[in-house]
From Swiss-Prot:
Pyridoxal 5'-phosphate binds at residues 97-98, 130, 215-218, 273. It comes from Mesorhizobium japonicum (strain LMG 29417 / CECT 9101 / MAFF 303099) (Mesorhizobium loti (strain MAFF 303099)). The modification N6-(pyridoxal phosphate)lysine is found at residue 244. NCBIfam families: argD, PRK01278.1. Belongs to the class-III pyridoxal-phosphate-dependent aminotransferase family. ArgD subfamily. Its main location: cytoplasm. Homodimer. Pathway: Amino-acid biosynthesis; L-arginine biosynthesis; N(2)-acetyl-L-ornithine from L-glutamate: step 4/4. The lineage of its organism: Bacteria, Pseudomonadati, Pseudomonadota, Alphaproteobacteria, Hyphomicrobiales. This is Acetylornithine aminotransferase. One of its GO terms (biological process) is L-arginine biosynthetic process. Keywords: Amino-acid biosynthesis, Aminotransferase, Arginine biosynthesis, Cytoplasm, Pyridoxal phosphate, Transferase. May also have succinyldiaminopimelate aminotransferase activity, thus carrying out the corresponding step in lysine biosynthesis. Coiled coil: none annotated. It is found in: Cytoplasm.
Length: 399
C-alpha cells in the first residue's frame, strides 16, 4: 500500500497550491506560477475573481441545497439566460461535463424513441474525441486507453476519422440517432473542425433525420472569443453539452436542446440530485455577468491574436521544439517537435503551467481575463523554456 489514501488514478505534479490571484497560483511554499492551464479550461475568469467570490459567499450564507423537488430561482434565471444567448429552448443542469454528455446522448435517443423509432440509438463520433469518463462517454470517445479493463464497451457508438465527413456519411444506418462532435477538439490536440465540415454534418443530420450534438465542454463559454465555438461557423446544433468555464471553477455543467430535440425528456425520465443547486447557479450567473459584458468577448479575440502572434514567432525561432501553433481564441496549442512531456516540464521549470494533450500537443488555456502584460510574460517564459530545450539539442548534437 502506498502512503496516500487516494486512488492512484492521477500522475500529479509535485506542486500544492495555497491560493490563486487572477492568472497566478501560489504554492504552499510561496512560489508563484503563471497559470495557463486554467484547471483544464475551467477557470474562465481566473482565480478568486471578486464577482464570483461575492456571488458564491452571498448564496452560501442563504441556501446550499434543496434538490430538484422544488423551484430554484437561480436555475430558472441561468437557464433563461442560456436560452436567450443560444440556439436552445431547454436546459438541464448537471454537475460536470461527462454528466452533460450523458444527458445529451439520452436526449437524442429518447427523441427517436418517442417519435416511434426506438431502433435509432447509435451515435457517430470522431477519432481523438474526449467526452468524459463514464462508461457511455468513454465508449463515445473510443480511446482504448480509457476503455481498457472496464468490460464490454457500451454499445451504440460508431467512430470515424477526425474531420472525415465522407466516412461519417457512410456510417449512417437506419439505427443512427445522432452525430456527436467537438467544434474544437481539446484533449485530441486543439484541433478545430472546419466550418465546411460542420455545415456538411448539419446537412447530413437534416437529410437523414438525425440530431446534431455539440460537445462544447472545453471550447465553450468565451474560450474561442465567441460565447460558443460553433458560432464562428454559424452552424447550430440540436443539442449541446457545456461545463468547465460556465462554473469558473465551481463544478457544474448543462445540456442545452431545442424544444423539438428535448420532446422526449419528460418528468421522471432523467434526473440529478445536485445538478442546478443554488450555489452552482449563483456562480454560473456570475460568470455570465462578466462574459456577456459589452466588449468582453471582443477583448478575448484581441488578446488571442496577440498571444498567437507571439507563439508563432517562438515556433519560427525554435522549430526543433515547436512545429506549429494551433487553435483559436484563448484555446491554443503548441504542436511539439519533441515529446510534449519534455516541453511541459520545461515550461513548468519556468513557472508556467500548461496542459499536455493528444497528438503531441501542449494546451495553453489562460483565463479569459488574462492581461496583455501577463501574455507577454508567458511568451517570455515559453521562449526561455524552448531555448533551453533547443540548446540541449545543440549540445547533444555536438558530442
Amino acid at each position: 500500500m502506498s502512503g496516500s489514501a487516494l486512488y492512484e488514478t492521477f500522475a500529479r505534479a509535485p506542486l500544492a497550491f495555497d491560493h490563486g490571484e487572477g492568472t497566478w497560483l501560489v504554492t504552499d511554499k510561496g512560489e508563484r506560477y503563471l497559470d495557463f492551464a486554467g484547471g483544464i479550461a475551467v477557470n474562465s475568469l481566473g482565480h478568486s475573481h471578486p464577482h464570483l467570490v461575492a456571488a458564491l459567499t452571498e448564496q452560501a450564507a442563504k441556501l446550499w441545497h434543496v434538490s430538484n423537488l422544488y423551484e430554484i430561482p437561480g436555475q430558472s434565471r441561468l437557464g433563461q439566460r442560456l436560452v436567450d444567448a443560444t440556439f436552445a429552448d431547454k436546459v438541464f443542469f448537471t454537475n460536470s461535463g461527462a454528466e452533460a454528455l450523458e444527458c445529451a446522448i439520452k436526449t437524442a435517443r429518447r427523441y427517436h424513441f418517442v417519435k416511434g423509432h426506438p431502433e435509432r440509438f447509435r451515435v457517430i463520433t470522431f477519432e481523438g474525441a474526449f467526452h468524459g469518463r463514464t462508461l457511455a462517454t468513454i465508449a463515445a470517445g473510443g480511446q482504448y486507453k480509457y476503455l481498457e479493463g472496464f468490460g464490454p464497451k457500451v454499445e451504440g457508438f460508431d467512430q470515424v476519422g477526425f474531420d472525415d465527413i465522407d466516412a461519417a456519411e457512410k456510417a449512417i444506418t437506419p439505427e443512427t440517432a445522432a452525430i456527436l462532435i467537438e467544434p474544437v477538439q481539446g484533449e485530441g490536440g486543439i484541433r478545430p473542425v472546419p466550418t465546411q465540415s460542420l455545415k456538411r454534418l448539419r446537412q447530413l443530420c437534416d437529410q437523414h433525420g438525425l440530431l446534431l450534438i455539440y460537445d462544447e465542454v472545453q471550447c465553450g463559454i468565451g474560450r474561442t472569443g465567441k460565447l460558443f465555438a460553433h458560432e464562428w461557423s454559424g452552424v447550430a446544433p440540436d443539442i449541446m453539452a457545456i461545463a468547465k468555464g460556465i462554473g469558473g471553477g465551481f463544478p457544474m455543467g448543462a445540456c442545452l436542446a431545442t424544444d423539438e430535440a428535448a420532446v422526449g425528456m419528460t418528468a421522471g425520465v432523467h434526473g440529478t440530485t445536485f445538478g442546478g443547486n443554488p450555489l452552482a447557479m449563483a456562480v454560473g450567473n456570475a460568470v455570465l455577468d462578466v462574459v456577456l459584458e459589452d466588449g468582453f468577448l471582443e477583448d478575448v479575440q484581441r488578446k488571442a491574436l496577440l498571444m498567437k502572434q507571439g507563439l508563432a514567432a517562438i515556433a519560427d525561432e525554435f522549430p526543433d521544439v515547436v512545429e506549429d501553433i494551433r487553435g483559436t481564441g484563448l484555446m491554443l496549442g503548441l504542436k511539439c517537435a519533441m515529446p510534449n512531456t519534455k516541453v511541459n516540464m520545461a515550461l513548468r521549470d519556468q513557472h508556467l503551467l500548461a496542459v499536455p494533450a493528444g497528438d503531441n500537443v501542449i494546451r495553453l488555456l489562460p483565463p479569459l481575463t488574462v492581461t496583455d502584460a501577463e501574455i507577454h510574460e508567458a511568451l517570455n517564459r515559453i521562449r526561455a523554456g524552448a531555448k533551453g530545450l533547443a540548446d540541449a539539442i545543440a549540445v547533444a548534437a555536438a558530442k
